[in-house]
A protein has these predicted regions:
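Short beta-strand/turn micro-motifs composed of small residues
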Residues: 6, 18, 44, 109, ...
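Short beta-strand elements in bilobed, periplasmic/extracellular small-molecule ligand-binding domains
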Residues: 63-83
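Conserved beta-strand scaffold positions in the cores of enzyme catalytic domains, especially
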Residues: 14-16, 42, 74-76, 135, ...
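Hydrophobic alpha-helical segments within soluble ligand-binding/sensing domains
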Residues: 16-42, 85-94, 115, 156-174
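Flexible loop/turn connectors
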Residues: 94-190
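An alpha-beta-alpha
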Residues: 26-69, 181-190
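Short, small-residue-biased leader/transition segments that mark boundaries at the very start
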Residues: 1-9
Length: 192
């Protein structure tokens, strides 16, 4: 699903369209639980709670707690470039690999770029994809299908996100033409 939101910045209303981060993360965690992973780990940046993407963290944690599954939040991804993030991902991979050597590790990564980095690190160490790992990305970006092995990913309907964003922009532009413009109504939740 998609979420439309409106925020006020210096008395200006700005709308945003985003995917349903909570539902996507819930689906990812549920898949890893269903596939009998011994421990679930979510790899992400330390996202502020006010950002819609924080719902990925919240849903992952809620789902693991609901099903009483051991889990870890690794919110240590930082960096301003691919190289910086890849270097950080090496540390994260090493930590996970050393901490859970005899466990099936279900890794939910915040996006498909992170998932591809993690997949490459697994292959660099093991030369294959061992049964002790399962990865899920988020975005359904081309990198997920073009990786050394296709990556399971939570799909975002980019075409629908774009269409909804354009509709909101047109609606705002039409409203501004009026003598007394009215800001858009409350945020709406769109399911697809």
């Amino acid at each position: 699903g998609l979420v439309g939101s409106e925020m006020c910045i210096r008395d200006r209303h700005i709308c945003g369209v985003t995917s349903d981060n909570y539902m996507g993360a819930l689906q990812a965690a549920t898949l890893l639980i269903r596939d009998k992973c011994d421990v679930l780990i979510h790899v992400n940046a330390d996202v502020p709670k006010s950002i819609p993407a924080y719902d990925r963290i919240r849903a992952f944690e809620d789902t693991c707690q609901e099903y009483h599954v051991p889990y870890e939040l690794n919110l240590n991804v930082i960096g301003d470039s691919y190289q910086d993030i890849f270097a950080q991902m090496k540390h994260i991979f090493s930590d996970i690999d050393e901490k859970y050597p005899d466990k099936k590790k279900g890794i939910f990564l915040a996006n498909d770029t992170y998932a591809n980095m993690f997949l490459n690190l697994i292959f660099q160490k093991y030369g294959c994809f061992p049964d002790s790992y399962e990865l899920v990305g988020f975005d359904n970006s081309p990198i997920a299908s073009e990786a050394i092995l296709p990556i399971t990913t939570v799909g975002q309907q980019i075409d629908l996100i774009a269409k909804t964003a354009i509709e909101l922009l047109v609606q705002q532009m039409e409203e501004r033409k009026k003598r007394r413009p009215v800001s858009l109504s409350k945020p709406c939740l769109l399911y697809t």
